[in-house]
């Protein structure tokens, strides 16, 4: 984001606002160099693409209508490490029990201790509060996701249409996903009824990676197993 914003502001004279997108897939260059060359190169390349897009915009409005709404959601805490260090989650989050009642500070510590001694049952596990948001700016609609969502949940692509000449599944992957279990559409962008659709990650929260269920494998011996 740093080099990207710097280049946009240098060339446009305005203020650049950077929003994360669907960054859950960890699709980064395989660079072994211990420097920031790739950061600068990619930031400048993306900035130039953004500026080029402004030369011939598909839509523009001088007075765009603005709308905003959000939905509070609650997510069960199942990760064993999160349960052990549950007091750390209370900073910036509201925590509830399975019946929807707020959990006070000392009870949070007690839950962590109980989990360390005998593992919490599903009924005893706490829930953490987060939110999903939607912003309309003229013809654009932004969906705010409180985490790092995998791109295939946003646009699909299980049929290989976005692979750009690369194999859909790495042949060296020791745990390849079963694409037969991949979700069918419509995907998130398909549901945004606007000409311009954006899915923004890390929107007001970071609950972790949002992984397609078919691509989520956990070995029973791992300490993070619920």
Where are these regions (language model features)?
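Non-catalytic substrate/cofactor recognition surfaces at enzyme active-site rims
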Residues: 1-226
């Amino acid at each position: 984001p740093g080099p990207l914003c710097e280049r946009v502001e240098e060339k446009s004279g305005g203020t650049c606002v950077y929003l994360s997108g669907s960054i859950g897939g960890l699709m980064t260059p395989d660079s072994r160099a211990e420097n920031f060359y790739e950061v600068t190169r990619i930031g400048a390349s993306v900035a130039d693409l953004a500026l080029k897009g402004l030369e011939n915009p598909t839509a523009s409005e001088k007075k765009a209508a603005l709308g905003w709404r959000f939905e509070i959601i609650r997510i069960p805490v199942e990760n064993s490490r999160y349960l052990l260090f549950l007091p750390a989650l209370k900073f910036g989050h509201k925590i509830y029990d399975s019946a929807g009642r707020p959990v006070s500070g000392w009870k949070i510590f007690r839950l962590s201790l109980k989990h360390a001694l005998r593992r919490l049952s599903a009924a005893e596990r706490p829930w953490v509060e987060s939110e999903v948001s939607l912003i309309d700016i003229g013809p654009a609609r932004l969906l705010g996701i409180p985490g790092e969502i995998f791109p295939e949940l946003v646009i699909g692509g299980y049929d290989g249409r976005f692979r750009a000449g690369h194999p859909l599944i790495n042949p060296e992957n020791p745990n390849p996903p079963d694409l037969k279990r991949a979700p069918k559409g419509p995907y998130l962008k398909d549901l945004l009824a606007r000409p311009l659709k954006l899915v923004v990650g890390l929107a007001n929260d970071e609950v972790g990676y949002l992984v397609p269920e078919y691509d989520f494998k956990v070995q029973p011996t791992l300490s993070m197993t619920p």
